[in-house]
Regions:
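Helix-breaking motifs and short loop linkers at transmembrane-helix boundaries and internal kinks
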Residues: 67, 88-93, 242, 274, ...
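Juxtamembrane intracellular "pre-TM" segments in multi-pass secondary transporters
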Residues: 1-3, 180-216, 399-403
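C-terminal ends and interior cores of transmembrane alpha-helices
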Residues: 77-90, 285-297
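Short amphipathic helix-loop junctions that connect adjacent transmembrane helices
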Residues: 26-38, 232-246
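Cytoplasmic helix-loop-helix junction between adjacent transmembrane helices
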Residues: 98-137, 322-323
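Interfacial helix-cap and linker-helix signal at transmembrane-aqueous boundaries
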Residues: 31-32, 62-63, 150-155, 237-238, ...
């Protein structure tokens, strides 16, 4: 199942999340020192997700037509440009523009990357594959802030932007030279796209639109959590426990670690019992962690709560990704993953904007509690999901035993 090409794709996913994560511990604190309010910081964080949200679906369609590699290289290139220009940003508006530029880069690379990973994989193996992919993805999410916090503490904030630039350039070069996509591959992609358009193929299989929509709502919950953590969690940790940049990076690292290592058991469970149950259980566990944020009486209690939130979210993510592949026509799979990714980014946009304003009105502690309640509401959409794995492996084994 894990081929050389998939290992390279996993490496590209790691580099994409590592580079952006390196910058995250410094961004909101730096913007706050330049005079940005909590709501302005929310806008800065949301600009990345908003740009990604607006570009992922058209870039997914473009990837189905012209091939995958060019879009991934282009995305890494835009991230490198944005990271370099951060050295010259001195106001909130300039941060917003650069976040948007980096978001366009992310919107270009992720649909193509995920489509390449899921191509030619049997449905009963998708959960484990996505679990392994998400483990690598979230290792980058966790290690980026940890490394970025250490860089900022020892070398200054400007050094984190240099590090992000180098990582993005490395990603572009690895994709360009390690992934082989021939002209005939691109012509075949274009031919499939033309045939799909001519046949007017539906993206979501008949009877599964409500299931697909409910899964996207739960996925959006993860986006809200990420934006909340990126925008307000560093400020909350500083206000409550006088956290240093290294301490903030450690909190984000444990969230990423939980996201990384609970994807594999989540993926295995997804292939064994189906998609619906892991989505529901994982999102509720994540909600328990978020509610614990507001009750944390010490830095280490907050550290544990953030880790629990990450673990729960990770357990549900492979099931949502596998469900998206299950219910969508293979000829429009990159577009489908565009919607999958867009739901996450919609959550990021709304989360950072809404909770930035909530924090200005009721304070950071009030915003934390409000987010916990919102997380519970979004998690309950999992109850509307219809099982998509035709015969979960555990049920199949039980049936064979009875026979």
């Amino acid at each position: 199942m894990i081929t050389r090409k998939i290992l390279v794709l996993f490496g590209l996913a790691f580099l994409a999340t590592l580079g952006y994560g390196i910058m995250i511990p410094s961004l909101s604190v730096h913007a706050h020192e330049l005079g940005a309010s909590h709501s302005a910081i929310g806008v800065i964080i949301s600009a990345f997700a908003a740009a990604q949200l607006l570009t992922q679906i058209p870039m997914g369609r473009l990837s189905d037509r012209v091939g995958r590699v060019y879009l991934v290289v282009f995305g890494f290139g835009l991230m490198a440009v944005a990271a370099t220009l951060y050295h010259f940003a001195t106001s909130a508006n300039e941060f917003i523009v650069l976040q948007a530029l980096a978001g366009v880069g992310a919107g270009s690379l992720w649909p193509a990357l995920m489509a390449m990973i899921t191509e030619n994989v049997a449905p009963e193996e998708r959960g484990r594959l996505m679990g392994a992919f998400n483990t690598v993805f979230f290792l980058g999410v966790g290690m980026g802030p940890l490394i970025g916090g250490l860089i900022a503490s020892n070398l200054g904030r400007s050094a984190v932007f240099n590090a992000w630039t180098l990582v993005a350039i490395l990603g572009a070069l690895v994709c360009l030279f390690a992934i082989k996509e021939t002209a005939s591959d691109r012509r075949a992609s274009a031919a499939r796209a033309r045939a799909t358009k001519a046949a007017d193929v539906q993206m979501v299989n008949a009877g599964f639109m409500a299931t697909f929509t409910a899964a996207l709502v739960v996925r959006a919950r993860g986006g809200v959590c990420s934006s909340f953590n990126n925008a307000l969690l560093p400020l909350y940790a500083v206000a409550m426990f006088e956290a240093t940049p290294a301490m903030i990076g450690s909190i984000m690292f444990i969230h990423g670690l939980g996201l990384a290592f609970f994807n594999i058991p989540g993926g295995m469970m997804t292939d064994k019992v189906g998609r619906r149950l892991p989505i529901l259980v994982g999102s509720l566990v994540a909600t328990a962690g978020v509610l614990w944020y507001s009750a944390a009486g010490s830095y280490w209690a907050l550290f544990a709560a953030v880790g629990l939130a990450g673990a729960g979210a990770a357990f549900s993510t492979p099931a949502i990704a596998a469900l998206a592949a299950d219910v969508c026509d293979p000829r429009r799979r990159a577009e489908a993953f565009g919607y999958f990714l867009t739901s996450f980014n919609l959550g990021m946009v709304l989360g950072s904007l809404v909770f930035g304003f909530v924090s200005d009105m009721v304070g950071l502690s009030g915003a934390v509690l409000t987010w916990g309640i919102t997380s519970l509401v979004l998690s309950l959409f999992a109850l509307a999901i219809r099982e998509t794995l035709a015969q979960p492996r555990g049920m199949a084994v039980a049936g064979e035993a009875r026979a």
